[in-house]
């Protein structure tokens, strides 16, 4: 299923194309983010929510299309 990555109640979540919510993402959850192509990332939390891609951390790409 695909949707848009959002922040809801201080936690990343996904709103799907049909209007339903995933229900909140958790540390260790993996999903695909659409950039120029689909990339697989892992969600983690330290001082803030980040995603890991190829061993590096990046800010969570809120507003991007994701696939889970």
Model-derived features: positions:
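Ser/Thr- (and often Asn-) enriched beta-sheet segments in non-cytosolic proteins
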Residues: 4-7, 32, 42, 65-67
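A short, compositionally biased
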Residues: 8-10, 25-29, 44-48
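Short coil-to-beta transition motif at edge beta-strands of beta-rich domains
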Residues: 21-35
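Short, compact, well-ordered microdomains
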Residues: 37-68
